[in-house]
Each structure stands twice: as C-alpha cells, then as structure tokens.
C-alpha cells in the first residue's frame, strides 16, 4: 500500500515540481535584475548629473560632485548588501520546502491510519 500510494503521489508531484522549478527560475531572474536596478538607479542619476555639472563648471563643482554621490551611495550600498544575500536565500529554501511539506504529511498520515486501527481493534 505504501509503495503504491507513494509512486502515485510522486507522479502527481512530478508535474507540480516541474512547474515549481520553472516558476522559481523566472522569480530568481526577476530578483537578479532587481538587484542591479537598485545600484543602477543611483548610477543613471549620477551620469546625468555629472555631464550637467561638468558642463556648468568643472573646477568649483568637482568637490561637491564626489561628496553628493558618496553620501547617497553609502546608505544604498549598505541595504543592498544585506538584501542581496537575503534575496537568494529565500528562493533556495523555497524549492526544498514545497516537496517536504507534501511529503511530511503523507508518511505520517499513512502510519497514523494503521496505528489508530491497531489499538482500536
């Protein structure tokens, strides 16, 4: 009975698992672009401001230019670093979690039924 039930469930899970990995792949891809986007957001602002300031005045503003980018860069970099490891970590536990959830209840349920019947009888 156990062998028969396990294969059936595994077959049903096979398509589900196949779908889950596919979903995880796009999710990870979406997260990866998001990470670069965060650093890129300040970057586009810096280049756009850099040419404008350079055009306006190279000598007086160079001192302010490095200060302005450094101040915004440091705070974003700190949150980005913790977020970068945090993003990859959730997706990795997710794939094992879905298979474990369905598998854990199945084995306990099967033994529970016979265990209850044994004492009952």
Curated annotation (Swiss-Prot):
Residues covered by region (Disordered): 1-20, 32-121
Pfam families assigned: Amelogenin (PF02948)
Biological-process GO terms, alphabetical: enamel mineralization
SMART domains tied to this protein: Amelogenin
Biased composition (Pro residues): 85-111
Keywords (A to Z) from UniProt: Biomineralization, Extracellular matrix, Repeat, Secreted
Positions with biased composition (Low complexity): 59-71
GO terms assigned for molecular function: structural constituent of tooth enamel
Cellular component annotations (GO), alphabetically ordered: collagen-containing extracellular matrix; extracellular region
Polar residues: compositionally biased ranges: 48-58
Keyword Repeat set for record: yes
Protein location: Secreted, Extracellular space, Extracellular matrix
PANTHER family the record matches: AMELOGENIN, X ISOFORM (PTHR46794:SF2), AMELOGENIN, Y ISOFORM (PTHR46794)
Its biological purpose: Plays a role in the biomineralization of teeth. Seems to regulate the formation of crystallites during the secretory stage of tooth enamel development. Thought to play a major role in the structural organization and mineralization of developing enamel.
Family: Belongs to the amelogenin family.
Protein name as annotated: Amelogenin
């Amino acid at each position: 009975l156990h062998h028969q039930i396990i294969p059936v469930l595994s077959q049903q899970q096979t398509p589900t698992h196949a779908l889950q990995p596919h979903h995880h792949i796009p999710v990870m891809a979406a997260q990866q672009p998001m990470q670069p986007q965060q650093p890129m957001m300040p970057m586009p602002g810096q280049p756009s401001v850099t040419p404008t300031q350079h055009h306006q005045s190279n000598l007086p503003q160079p001192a302010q230019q490095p200060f302005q980018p450094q101040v915004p860069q440091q705070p974003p970099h700190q949150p980005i670093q913790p977020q970068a490891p945090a993003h990859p970590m959730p997706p990795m536990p997710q794939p094992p979690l879905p298979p474990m959830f369905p598998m854990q209840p199945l084995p306990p349920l099967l033994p529970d039924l016979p265990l209850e019947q044994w004492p009952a009888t």
